[in-house]
Design a protein with these regions (language model features):
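Membrane-embedded helix-loop-helix hairpins and adjacent transmembrane boundary segments
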Residues: 1-178
Length: 178
């Protein structure tokens, strides 16, 4: 599925929509196939070299998603007061905080020699590994989203009603006895 998404994003969204709107369907399909082949080669290389890299990338991806998306989703469901400005500010705070922390210890885009500090426990903030920093980013996201949402206008009434309807599902009808 991910390979299909990558090839479609490159061939249709990037090439057809932006770079070459006149590309034929056959040309777009050819670009998609080439992109998929390149993605397979890159994924295979990164999965093998260095060993353990794929597991680290998955851990970092979950940390990044947790720091940037999870708080906004939770607050969007459980708080009628969280607004778009708060959610965006929180998401950016979570995302930027974890990316900066990762780049400080792992290097910019994992390029050797670009790390600011050694990736060892004695240098980590409160002993928190870059692989685990997503929890800190999520906490920062919650705090910033809460502060910004309460410092700005609340969401419109229809949005607050939508949040309430998500929190308290009504179902399709009454309960029945089987």
């Amino acid at each position: 599925g991910l390979l299909l998404a990558i090839s479609s994003a490159i061939s249709h969204d990037l090439i057809k929509r932006n770079l070459n709107p006149n590309i034929t369907d056959a040309g777009e399909l050819k670009v998609a196939r080439i992109t998929m082949a390149i993605a397979i080669v890159v994924a295979t290389y990164l999965g093998i070299n260095p060993p353990g890299f794929a597991a680290q990338v998955v851990a970092l991806a979950f940390g990044i998603a947790g720091a940037s998306l999870f708080p906004a989703l939770m607050m969007g469901i459980f708080s009628k007061r969280i607004n778009n400005l708060g959610a965006i500010a929180g998401m950016l705070t979570g995302l930027i905080s974890i990316l900066v922390y990762i780049f400080i210890f792992k290097g910019w885009f994992f390029i050797s020699g670009t790390a600011s500090f050694p990736d060892t426990e004695e240098y980590w903030l409160f002993g928190i590994s870059p692989l685990s920093f997503g929890a800190v980013g999520a906490l920062l996201n919650f705090i910033v989203a809460f502060i910004v949402s309460y410092a700005t206008m609340p969401p419109p009434a229809h949005i607050q009603e939508l949040v309430e309807s998500v929190r308290s599902p009504r179902g399709a009808g009454g309960a029945i006895d089987h």
